[in-house]
Design a protein with these regions (language model features):
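Glycine-rich tight-turn/loop motif centered on a GG-T
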Residues: 1-11, 39-57, 130-140, 176-177
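Phosphate/pyrophosphate-binding betaalpha-module
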Residues: 8, 12-27
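Short acidic, glycine-rich surface-loop motifs adjacent to enzyme active sites
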Residues: 21-54, 79-81
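Solvent-exposed loop/turn segments at secondary-structure junctions
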Residues: 34-37, 83-85, 114-117
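Alpha-helix-loop-beta-strand connector modules within alpha/beta enzyme cores
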Residues: 51-78
Length: 191
């Protein structure tokens, strides 16, 4: 954690972000850093039952109040890995994903390990949890709409809608022939 006050944060830690925003930055990754002198909201840690100050990734104070409202950032906010210990061992993925979205995150990064097609059920459970949170009001639909619009604007700005359509099955088969070839599997075992 960082013990900076709000004034210190604005004078030091936030300066590179403010400059990036002034220069047209389109995406910012949030960090799982705690600022207990600035963020007062906390949860009870799953790990040791202590008071756990929300890290910036889960903090509406940081992502909405400071980043968007004070600094004027209109781009996409993506999390660092949601599997990192600062999140997974203290908050847990279900609550953390909801808190992050409500804080202002647009894209959740690495919510679970996906090492094979068998792991698809883990991703489905995460998606189902978020859908359920929207349906029961824990995440406002407007919050999802805001993120969707920001991500679509970014894709448009990057020209991703102008790219020719690809044959997904052929692309997957090609990737598997490269990634899954015997030579690469042998190298993987050595590493």
């Amino acid at each position: 954690f960082i013990n900076s006050t709000y004034e210190q944060l604005m004078a030091f830690e936030i300066v590179p972000f403010a400059e990036a925003i002034k220069n047209g930055c389109k995406m910012i990754m949030s960090g799982h850093i705690q600022f207990p002198n600035i963020e007062k909201e906390a949860v009870i840690s799953k790990q040791d039952k202590s008071r756990y100050t929300l890290p910036a990734t889960l903090s509406k104070r940081f992502l909405t109040d400071i980043l968007r409202n004070e600094l004027g950032f209109e781009g996409v906010v993506i999390t660092d890995s949601m599997q990192m210990q600062a999140i997974s061992s203290h908050v847990g993925s279900e609550l953390a994903n909801i808190l992050a979205i409500n804080a202002g995150v647009d894209i959740l990064l690495m919510c679970t390990s996906l090492r094979s097609l068998k792991d698809e059920a883990k991703l489905k459970a995460i998606i189902d949890n978020i859908v359920s949170a929207v349906e029961d009001g824990r995440i406002p639909m407007e919050r999802i709409d805001e993120s969707t619009l920001r991500v679509l604007k970014l894709k448009k700005a990057l020209g991703l809608f102008d790219a020719p359509a690809i044959d997904v099955e052929a692309a997957v088969a090609n990737a598997l022939s490269i990634v899954g070839c015997q030579e690469n599997r042998a190298a993987e075992r050595l590493i």
